[in-house]
UniProtKB/Swiss-Prot annotation:
Family: Belongs to the EF-Ts family.
Role noted for this protein: Associates with the EF-Tu.GDP complex and induces the exchange of GDP to GTP. It remains bound to the aminoacyl-tRNA.EF-Tu.GTP complex up to the GTP hydrolysis stage on the ribosome.
Name of this protein: Elongation factor Ts
Keyword Cytoplasm: yes
Subcellular location: Cytoplasm
Alphabetical list of HAMAP family matching this protein: EF_Ts
A Pfam family reported for this protein in Swiss-Prot or TrEMBL: EF_TS
PANTHER family xref list: ELONGATION FACTOR TS, ELONGATION FACTOR TS, MITOCHONDRIAL
SUPFAM superfamilies, per database record: Elongation factor Ts (EF-Ts), dimerisation domain, UBA-like
Alphabetized InterPro entries for the sequence: EF-Ts_dimer_sf, Transl_elong_EFTs/EF1B, Transl_elong_EFTs/EF1B_dimer, Transl_elong_Ts_CS, UBA-like_sf
MF annotations from Gene Ontology: translation elongation factor activity
Region (Involved in Mg(2+) ion dislocation from EF-Tu): 79-82
Length: 293
């Protein structure tokens, strides 16, 4: 497979490795991006790649709760300027109210539903696009439910650039639930606990760590012990309950939750634009385009 400059660029952005190292890794793995990342990590050239990819699109997240139902949603716009527009914020609120009331199963299902104003969600968004003058999309949402003995934790960071909604069972302490949501916003765990990590992922990480240790020239008789220690650190990076609590790093999140006789049922974290590629433009050209207007 031919290795293109764009592939090398993408691998560099994901790993921070040098151009020649990236080209060599892609060549050795026949252009397989995931395998190239693993190969660079095994050689100690690249750090663990988080699958967040580049943050690109603009917009806002919003969270609303009503009794035992909560919704978190993300609506995208083309520019940050529009995301701060009052008309955009009104649309965000209206969509949240509709989803909270009607609980559609998907974005596609929501688009065809009638709103309180008589128009469908799709028609309402199209109307907003005509007024605001930018493409606007309802990207995603999650509707969460809880019992009477549980608490929602809602946290918006930077006015809605990151939104987190948590559910804690066994407590009605919304402040603690919000603290956990704030922690999730800051640290971005992928799982609640270790038992949610697939055996395949754990084994893959163990193999990478083993190769790293061997590359460092460590004796084989201590490699296994080293690998387990490093694997524990890996779990601390990706599992919420194993992490040091952001408000008090001397405590683990699981200790904070246990102190309330509670358990973390679930969490949803949205970061505006994560995984969406933004159109790349030359900055000098962009400035000149603005000057010419």
């Amino acid at each position: 497979m031919a290795i293109t400059a764009q592939m090398v660029k993408e691998l560099r952005e994901k790993t921070g490795a040098g151009m020649m190292d990236c080209k060599k890794a892609l060549t050795e793995t026949d252009g397989n991006m995931d395998k190239a990342i693993d190969l660079l990590r095994e050689k100690g050239i690249a750090k663990a790649a988080k699958k967040a990819d580049r943050i690109a699109a603009e917009g806002l997240t919003l969270i609303k709760t009503d009794g035992n139902t909560g919704v978190i949603l993300e609506v995208n716009s083309e520019t940050d300027f529009v995301a701060k527009n009052e008309g955009f914020k009104e649309l965000l609120n209206d969509l949240a109210d509709h989803i909270l009331a009607e609980k559609p199963e998907s974005v596609e299902a929501a688009m065809g539903q009638k709103m309180a104003n008589g128009s469908t969600v799709e028609e309402y968004i199209t109307s907003a696009v005509a007024k605001i003058g930018e493409k606007i999309t309802l990207r995603r949402f999650a509707v969460l439910t809880k019992g009477d003995d549980a608490a929602f934790g809602a946290y918006l960071h930077m006015g809605g650039k990151i939104g987190v909604l948590t559910v804690l069972n066994g407590t009605t302490d919304e402040e603690t639930a919000r603290d956990i949501a704030m922690h999730v916003a800051a640290v971005n765990p992928r799982f609640i606990s270790r038992d949610q990590v697939s055996e395949e992922e754990a084994n893959r990480e163990r193999e990478i760590l083993t190769q790293q240790a061997l590359q460092e020239g460590k004796p084989e008789n201590i490699v296994a012990k080293m690998v387990e220690g490093r694997l524990n650190k890996y779990f601390e990076e990706i599992c919420l309950l194993d992490q040091a609590f952001v408000k008090n790093p001397d405590e683990k999140v699981k200790q904070v939750v246990a102190a309330k006789n509670a358990t973390v049922e679930t969490f949803v974290r949205y970061e505006v634009g994560e995984g969406i590629e933004k159109r790349q433009e030359n900055f000098a050209e962009e400035v000149m385009n603005q000057v010419k207007k």
